[in-house]
């Protein structure tokens, strides 16, 4: 279910304070663990270091990211491909 419009987008307080302190286009990266925060128009032009569970992924916010969550742009899982079929490898030799 979608969030109620009257509540507005969710942004963690500590992220909102850091964004208010920074100016747009500044080179300083805002480090955050808050993957659940919604990207608002105030975030445009800022770079966030979003934690993916292991390391921080740099995310530069653009206009078309508004309304999405920060965590959507820092994948948590890596796909290394499906396991190879051992039987087919033996037949080829």
Curated annotation (Swiss-Prot):
InterPro entries: Ribosomal_uS19, Ribosomal_uS19_bac-type, Ribosomal_uS19_CS, Ribosomal_uS19_SF. GO terms for cellular component: cytoplasm; small ribosomal subunit. Signal peptide: none annotated. One of its GO terms (molecular function) is rRNA binding. The keyword Ribosomal protein applies. It comes from the Bacteria. Keywords: Ribonucleoprotein, Ribosomal protein, RNA-binding, rRNA-binding. Pfam families: Ribosomal_S19. Transmembrane segments: none annotated. The keyword Magnesium does not apply. One of its GO terms (biological process) is translation. Protein S19 forms a complex with S13 that binds strongly to the 16S ribosomal RNA. Belongs to the universal ribosomal protein uS19 family. This is Small ribosomal subunit protein uS19. It comes from Geobacter sulfurreducens (strain ATCC 51573 / DSM 12127 / PCA). The gene is rpsS.
